[in-house]
């Protein structure tokens, strides 16, 4: 049997100290040099052990301050289901309410953004064709739990009251309801989930370690004429969320 890598042994040691209440939630850990000296390893080994525990939500790093024992954090249940599109209210807000968490989100919309090649392919338009791009940061009790970047062809919503997803009389109503307001009926959505490591920007926004595991969901909404009318890249951190799919059964 191969020997356990040193950083995994140190991670187990740090985890054990936390379990035995040597360090409590919110406590700052000793320096890497001190931990390394106590455990007989170099600082790089301690760093890798801490990065692993940060990605698992056991520790948290604070820029310019050090590494701390993470406060207990409820893992958020993220439900994916077409049946959850409601005329009023947000599915995300419903999920958070069920967990007794305060739901909120921050967004930024840029109109008339040229579609990159991949987005153009997903929307069935020419590369460079104008789109409305909206970025979201979803929060549960003020802590980020999900990122999303949405793209809608300007040719579909331009000049209408729903051109801005988070502005106007239909602000925050969701893709299905907003499209219905301009006579576009959504028939179905296609989602492609894929595990990967977080980028540096995603890690910073989500408060997780760089390269921590996330689930990247590519979602596209289609009209009843089989036309793609919105596509989004949704990023969910594995350490903080569990993704559940509800599949309606029609009889």
Question: Which residues make up each language-model segment?
Answer:
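C-terminal regulatory/effector modules of DNA-binding transcriptional regulators
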Residues: 126, 139, 143-144, 154-251
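Structural motif
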Residues: 27, 129, 148, 212-213
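Residues within the alpha-helical elements of helix-turn-helix
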Residues: 34, 38, 205
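Short coil turns linking two alpha-helices in DNA-binding domains
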Residues: 41-42
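Alpha-helical residues within helix-turn-helix
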Residues: 27-28, 33-34
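Residues in the helix-turn-helix
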Residues: 45
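Short helix->loop/beta-hairpin flanking segments within DNA-binding domains
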Residues: 9-27
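HTH-adjacent hinge/linker in prokaryotic transcriptional regulators
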Residues: 2-9, 24, 37-38, 48-130, ...
């Amino acid at each position: 049997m191969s020997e356990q890598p040193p950083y995994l042994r140190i991670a187990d040691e740090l985890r054990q100290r936390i379990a035995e209440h040597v360090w409590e939630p919110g406590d700052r850990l000793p320096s890497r040099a001190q931990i390394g000296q106590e455990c007989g390893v170099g600082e790089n080994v301690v760093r890798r052990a801490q990065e692993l525990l940060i990605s698992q939500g056991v520790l948290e790093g604070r820029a310019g301050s050090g590494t701390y024992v993470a406060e207990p954090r409820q893992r958020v249940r993220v439900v994916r289901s077409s049946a959850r599109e409601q005329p009023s209210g947000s599915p995300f807000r419903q999920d958070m309410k069920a967990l007794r968490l305060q739901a909120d989100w921050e967004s930024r919309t840029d109109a008339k953004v040229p579609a990159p090649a991949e987005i153009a392919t997903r929307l069935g338009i020419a590369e460079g064709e104008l789109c409305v791009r909206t970025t979201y940061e979803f929060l549960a009790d003020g802590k980020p739990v999900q990122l999303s970047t949405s793209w809608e062809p300007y040719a579909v919503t331009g000049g209408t009251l729903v051109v801005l997803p988070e502005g106007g009389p239909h602000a925050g109503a969701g893709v299905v309801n907003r499209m219905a307001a301009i006579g576009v009926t959504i028939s179905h959505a296609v989602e492609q989930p894929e595990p990967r490591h977080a980028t540096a920007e995603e890690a910073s926004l989500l408060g997780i370690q760089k390269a921590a595991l996330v689930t990247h969901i590519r979602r596209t909404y289609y009209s009843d004429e089989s036309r793609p009318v919105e596509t989004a890249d949704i990023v969910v951190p594995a350490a903080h969320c569990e993704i559940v799919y509800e599949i309606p059964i029609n009889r």
